[in-house]
UniProtKB/Swiss-Prot annotation:
Enzyme Commission number(s): 2.1.1.170
Statement: the UniProt record of this protein carries the keyword Transferase: yes
Reactions accelerated catalytically: guanosine(527) in 16S rRNA + S-adenosyl-L-methionine = N(7)-methylguanosine(527) in 16S rRNA + S-adenosyl-L-homocysteine
Annotated positions binding S-adenosyl-L-methionine: G70, L75, I121, E122, R136
Record's subcellular location: Cytoplasm
Major localization class: cytoplasm
Protein's name according to its UniProt entry: Ribosomal RNA small subunit methyltransferase G
HAMAP family documented for this protein: 16SrRNA_methyltr_G
GO molecular function terms attached to this record: rRNA (guanine-N7-)-methyltransferase activity
Cellular component annotations (GO), alphabetically ordered: cytosol
Gene3D superfamilies: Vaccinia Virus protein VP39 (3.40.50.150)
Organism name: Methylococcus capsulatus (strain ATCC 33009 / NCIMB 11132 / Bath)
Length: 205
């Protein structure tokens, strides 16, 4: 299922990367028995809703530094970091048990390009800034932009994963924000998936 799904997404993930993706899923299932990190327990659903859903936005990432806000148990950050080792990912969450799991997963999977951080985005600072800030099931677009915009480098974008097209949220965005809405196709998932791409008005892609 994973190999077929990756093929449908156009991913060129190699054998070692596919193995790491499945190992991550197994680690998540193992820790979930004690820490209740996710409501998804079925392995097939995990492939679709954790791995493939996360990787459906891989082609939208750019630049070297990526921040995953409200990463929870490392989603979408860890799957993306596995298939894009050339980028550096900071995985941010205020939940101690979830960041504890992410730290252990990073160690066991040998992900040298991932830094887990336990903090709230409102109090998080970073001198270098980020090319992409990711948010999956995090907040409204206006809230995401308010929190994430100060952390963007010049040319940076906020990528917010949504279910249905977030029409009602678009009107709440402040002036000066350019928005692109992309329909995502996730193999094996019938529910709607959209990606909102936010950046300052007038900024070239």
């Amino acid at each position: 299922m994973l190999e077929r799904g990756l093929s449908e997404l156009g991913s060129d993930a190699g054998g070692d990367q596919r193995e790491r993706l499945l190992r991550f899923l197994e680690l998540l299932r193992k820790w979930n028995r004690v820490y209740s990190l996710t409501a998804i327990e079925d392995p097939c659903e995990g492939v679709r809703l954790h791995l493939l859903d996360s990787l459906s936005i891989a082609s939208f990432l750019h630049g070297r530094r990526v921040l995953d806000v409200g990463t929870g148990p490392g989603l979408p950050g860890i799957p993306l970091a596995i298939v894009q080792p050339e980028r550096r990912f900071v995985l941010l969450d205020c939940n101690a048990k979830k960041i504890r799991f992410v730290r252990q997963a990073v160690i066991e999977l040998g992900l040298a390009n991932v830094v887990p951080v336990q903090a709230r985005i409102e109090s998080f600072t970073d001198a270098e800034g980020f090319d992409c800030v990711l948010a999956r099931a995090y907040a409204s677009l206006a809230e995401i932009w308010t929190d994430a915009a100060p952390l963007l480098r010049t040319g940076g974008t906020v990528l917010a994963l949504k279910g249905r097209r977030p029409e009602a949220e678009l009107g709440d965005l402040p002036a000066g924000v350019a928005v692109g809405i992309h329909r995502l196709r996730v193999p094996g998932v019938e529910a709607e998936r959209h990606l909102a791409e936010l950046k300052p008005t007038g900024q070239d892609s």
